[in-house]
Amino acid sequence: MVDVVELKYVKKFLAKSAVHTLNYYDITFITEGKGAFSVDNQTYEAIPRDVLFSKPGEIRNWDTHHITNGYALIFEEEFLSFLFKDSLFVQHLSFFQIESSSSLLHLSDELYTRILETLHDIKMEIDSYQQGDVHVLRALLYEVLMLLDRAYLKMTSIEEGRSREVSNNHVRDR
């Protein structure tokens, strides 16, 4: 299973309570508005070009009044895992690892545009789906995951560099 859904459509089903738990992987792209978005009790102030990552079983909550639109790329692990020799492929992605430091990634304009175009391609492929023909869908999903993984690794290496700099400054100050 893989799908791309607009947040303004999903919001209708969350009207009574925005707190929910998913049983699939979800990568949410904020396109309009800004507001609080929580993943497993960690709250972020989400703005356009932000991406939020959720694993099955995590508790999510978002400000449906102020985050006005975006896209959710949802998929089950099985959709990809039997394609690769690594049955834990999805769990090995940097943003889905247990020890990942953040569920939030802010994209550059260029990457944001590229990924939104690919999400559009995924939606078109789903709409023209032929029974048993999932290879293009898998390839498009794989492309998005690899682009996000690269950006997430770059973000965390920059953050680690800043952390080491601050740590080194404290050592030098003594």
Where are these predicted regions, by residue range?
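A hydrophobic/aromatic-rich effector-binding and dimerization subdomain
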Residues: 1, 63-124, 150, 154
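Generic protein-terminus/edge-of-domain signal
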Residues: 1-45
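Amphipathic, well-ordered alpha-helical segments in soluble domains
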Residues: 26-29, 114-118, 140, 144-147
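Residues immediately flanking
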Residues: 32, 56, 75-77
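Short beta-strand His + acidic residue motifs that chelate non-heme Fe in jelly-roll/DSBH
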Residues: 36-38, 54, 59-66
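Short acidic-glycine-tyrosine-enriched beta hairpin
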Residues: 41-55
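Short, Lys/Arg-enriched, Trp-marked, Pro/Gly-tolerant hinge/linker segments that flank
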Residues: 106-109, 126-137, 148-174
